[in-house]
Amino acid sequence: MLKFLTPTAYASHHVTPATRFRSTPVKNLLFKQLTLLTGWNRSSYELGRRSFSSDLDSDTKSSTTTVSAKPHLDDCLTVIALPLPHKPLIPGFYMPIYVKDPKVLAALQESRRQQAPYAGAFLLKDDASSDSSSSSETENILEKLKGKELINRIHEVGTLAQISSIQGEQVILIGHRQLRITEMVSESEDPLTVKVDHLKDKPYDKDDDVIKATYFQVMSTLRDVLKTTSLWRDHVRTYTQACSLHIWHCLRHIGEFNYPKLADFGAGISGANKHQNQGVLEELDVHKRLELTLELVKKEVEINKIQESIAKAVEEKFSGDRRRIILKEQINAIKKELGGETDSKSALSEKFRGRIDPIKDKIPGHVLKVIEEELKKLQLLETSSSEFDVTCNYLDWLTVLPWGNFSDENFNVLRAEKILDEDHYGLSDVKERILEFIAVGGLRGTSQGKIICLSGPTGVGKTSIGRSIARALDRKFFRFSVGGLSDVAEIKGHRRTYIGAMPGKMVQCLKNVGTENPLVLIDEIDKLGVRGHHGDPASAMLELLDPEQNANFLDHYLDVPIDLSKVLFVCTANVTDTIPGPLLDRMEVITLSGYITDEKMHIARDYLEKTARRDCGIKPEQVDVSDAAFLSLIEHYCREAGVRNLQKQIEKIFRKIALKLVRKAASTEVPRISDDVTTDTEETKSLAKTDLESPETSAEGSTVLTDELATGDPTESTTEQSGEVAETVEKYMIDESNLSDYVGKPVFQEEKIYEQTPVGVVMGLAWTSMGGSTLYIETTFVEEGEGKGGLHITGRLGDVMKESAEIAHTVARRIMLEKEPENKLFANSKLHLHVPAGATPKDGPSAGCTMITSLLSLALKKPVRKDLAMTGEVTLTGRILAIGGVKEKTIAARRSQVKVIIFPEANRRDFDELARNVKEGLEVHFVDEYEQIFELAFGYDH
């Protein structure tokens, strides 16, 4: 079968059969236009005469060896059909094809020998089931198509092609005119022979204005394309050297404009697809064919413009880059000649060596080796390469780290204690533990080997304590938060192969602080992100916080071991439950339980008030906040364990006072002179001066202000003498009575609901994230009846607390059977147990003994003793087990004026460790059996 070259290959050359001509003047308009476009002239006549001959010239007596002139084109009514898969053959152009079928090739050679060297070239139709873009698919289709199958797959309209030459399997075809298949002649499959009709253009008026206008538009568009595309200019030169001779011949014989040739030429040299070219080939209306060609050529103009703009932009970019590179090299060469600055590579190398030379003996050997290798590599790289920037950044990080540079630690315990007391009030147990740590460091000469974790509610000063430890030890301080951190690269850095890669937080820390032994505060470690596609940050923290591993900590970016064993790590967390076990095991946890009321009072008076007053620009003599106001603020507005909310409320008070002071100052200013007064006379100035004088003037003429600020708040006026001038200072008094004017209505009410708890009601103690609180347990009857005993529980209780209520019900029934067997309350009564504050979720086992006491109080119809509170987990046998939050619960009891507290015996040690001011005034009983609680709660005199 046939194997065809690609359209690019066969479109790069084209010829048409040419005719001889005499020395006739050039009058054809088409020839004139093409001559202007290509620069062709009559001197090309000899070249055209030697290259081509015409089969239409009746005066021609001989022909060249390429084209036989004996047969006439109109006599070719039966031809061999050759399928063209990629593009139709346009008249006036030639196409090389490969014929592999021996039968077809022999038939073509036989046609040439019989001096009838013509065949029909027909475009192959697309097959929807095959990939038209695949050459191998096309070859397979051509091999399978035979006879009727082939004629059904080719277009009816094709081109009469002259067989110009046959060399091996290559056949050169030259297009002449359009053909239409009428019927198939050969019955055999190969070669396919068909009968054809020669198609002629429809008659047209050569003087028609519309056709002329279209013709000129095509010529104008061709001129635009030829200005931008050299390939098209080559096409036109070749075409005019052949086609123009034919046009002169036509002028001599018929004397008409050859518009069809222009349409064929434009379609043939355009980059149109095969369907568009086939449409031009099949169109016999000359005007419509010119319009189709005009559309194709205009598309080519647009494509060429886009290509030209892209090429121009690329050229400008590269020329600009080349210019900058050349100028940069020239500048470097000039600097070298002048003996000034060296090139960038030398300057960078000198900078890096200047960093490491003074500390070369302190840099570890493996790190120094890497630095030397990278410096050698830097000299071999081009400054314009991306690897150069990567190497520079890497060397910059390696050489800027504080190799061998340590802060001189201060292990003076007295100085550290003073600093801790200056920064924080209370927290004596925490301070004691920190001082122990510093003392051990002083004896050992270093404070390495410990990872401290400060655990406690928000606002208790965990972060500020870490900063105080750094100040006490004279270490540099660095803080970073890991809350929500899910990317391991934030801790261990990115690989250098990534764009924008950076080291991890620890390497950045060492660079920022400039020492190898800073104090690093890792905040919110209990909120560390979970494992994801970026790795497991908790596992990465293990290497960082393990004293046995962080001596050789490997950052992904630096890729060299770094010694972090001298770094003191302090972590903070609100709770330790969410910290992974292996990570928590490497820490020494110090619990900050929060501040009691007395501690908050001191903090508010000695720290927060002074800071807020200074930040608001208020003098001490302008505001006086009473202790009662601070106490009310703590108990009714800020019950959390920390002091952060207390600080906000104090700042709110001072901001409102600052606003009042500014408004007062603005209202007492002397009004300015009206804008409509343009000039001041001496009389006016004298009157103004007189008006400004005070009614009361000292002997020396100094003014004494006596006006007082008229506000609704209690104020007092004090006079201060400064030299000879007396000023009136207004002082705002803030006490419990007017506190709500500054901070709004109280948020919390009194926890103590009853002066004397009624029957069935007992006060318990609970722990919350805001500290401790009191908790009432209430029990009452629902209905009585034989065998209707039961218990209904409400109060938004958790599963553990519901189980505690069931246990309490069982234990209470057992105790009543022992104490009063005749009492059938639990057997015949349905009871309802409720825990107030139903919107607040509650859970935990520590209210077990309180629930038993509430049930027994109802059964005995006897209230418990006044000012009693209790807490403790109870078992079915009546044993009292340990609970948590002893300090917080004790503080809550004091806040509710409780005098007697019952704790489990197992918590005696926890209570003994409390500060004296926390335990003062409390009667505390420690029990391990409920029988002891029964005696304390009900064994009293009415």
Curated annotation (Swiss-Prot):
Active-site residues, as the UniProt record annotates them: S846, K889
EC code: 3.4.21.53
Domain Lon N-terminal residue range list: 79-301
UniProt superkingdom: Eukaryota
PROSITE patterns: LON_N (PS51787), LON_PROTEOLYTIC (PS51786), LON_SER (PS01046)
Residues the entry annotates as binding ATP: G456, P457, T458, G459, V460, G461, K462, T463
One GO CC annotation: mitochondrial matrix
Residue ranges occupied by any Lon proteolytic domain in the UniProt entry: 756-940
GO molecular function, one term: ATP-dependent peptidase activity
Biased composition (Polar residues): 695-705
Subunit structure: Homohexamer or homoheptamer. Organized in a ring with a central cavity.
Family membership noted in the UniProt record: Belongs to the peptidase S16 family.
Note: This protein may be expected to contain an N-terminal transit peptide but none has been predicted.
Annotated function: ATP-dependent serine protease that mediates the selective degradation of misfolded, unassembled or oxidatively damaged polypeptides as well as certain short-lived regulatory proteins in the mitochondrial matrix. May also have a chaperone function in the assembly of inner membrane protein complexes. Participates in the regulation of mitochondrial gene expression and in the maintenance of the integrity of the mitochondrial genome. Binds to mitochondrial DNA in a site-specific manner.
Official protein name in the record: Lon protease homolog 4, chloroplastic/mitochondrial
Source organism per UniProt: Arabidopsis thaliana (Mouse-ear cress)
